[in-house]
Amino acid sequence: MPVLDIAEFAAAIPDYLPIVGLDPGEKTIGVAVSDVTLTVASPLALIKKTKFSEDAATLFQLMGSRKAAGIVIGLPMNMDGTEGVRCQSNRALGRNLLRLQPHIPITFWDERLSTAAVTRVLIEEHDVNRKRRAEVVDKMAAAWILQGALERMRGIAEAAGKGF
């Protein structure tokens, strides 16, 4: 299955199966999971990057334990809407995951400022110290990314006159 746009992705997800969201960074991959109604995203895990094959195995194990049916990967677009080096890296991650599991639907979601937004919430609203923020910010950013994709998927379904 190729990488899909968000509408195709939404159509490819079976009913009552969750999806995961990824916030890939240089050292870690934040992972979030949706509920089965595709309404709410929650932080799930932080994968510390090692070898791609090991990281992918960890991700697929997490997905299997949650019966997740698809992957939303954050795409850190530049503020002017162009794609930089990090976007290329995240797109390569998607292609490489598809090589290992070609049946899993994958889409990308613009994640501009997701980490900054989550960090601001952690500092201003929860007074979380720097050490604790480092432990949770990437998986919370993954939830932020996934929540945005879920809301767009819901909008697509509603515009088509379908329940979600």
From Swiss-Prot:
EC number: 3.1.-.-
InterPro entries assigned: RNaseH-like_sf, YqgF, YqgF/RNaseH-like_dom, YqgF/RNaseH-like_dom_sf
Keywords: Cytoplasm, Hydrolase, Nuclease, Ribosome biogenesis
GO cellular component, as recorded: cytosol
Pfam (any one): RuvX
Location within or outside the cell: Cytoplasm
GO molecular function annotation: nuclease activity
Principal location listed in the UniProt entry: cytoplasm
GO biological process assignments: rRNA 5'-end processing
Coiled coil: none
Known role: Could be a nuclease involved in processing of the 5'-end of pre-16S rRNA.
Family that this chain belongs to: Belongs to the YqgF nuclease family.
HAMAP family the UniProt entry points to: Nuclease_YqgF
Protein name: Putative pre-16S rRNA nuclease
Species for this entry: Caulobacter sp. (strain K31)
